[in-house]
Amino acid sequence: MLELHQFRHSPYCLKVRMALAAKKLEYRTVEITPAIGQIDIFQKTGQKKLPVLFDNETIIHDSSSIIRHLEKIEIEPKLIPEGLKEACQVQIIENWADTTLAKSIKIVFLEELTKLSLIHI
């Protein structure tokens, strides 16, 4: 069975969970505590960042690499177009979402979290 090591609130882990759901693949999650839990995953995989997918003896890290792996093990529905032009367009949008958009969301999220924590003091 597929095993997704994740931090639930990570947008990259959410991206993988959405791909797994779209493919209707069975999997189990292993919640990793930021910082402390990452030591354990680093010792197992050599990777510091999440998500990490275990597919039997195969270890895949990075949300985009995991999705490419899922495309190989479950063909339908396709998450990445077959045509070169369309696949490149998807990759450009994905790279933008993973970098520029994710950083912006993180800034807003942290600002809102700070406001909430100040309200409860």
What are these regions (language model features)?
Residues 1-119:
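GST-like domain detector, emphasizing the conserved glutathione-binding G-site
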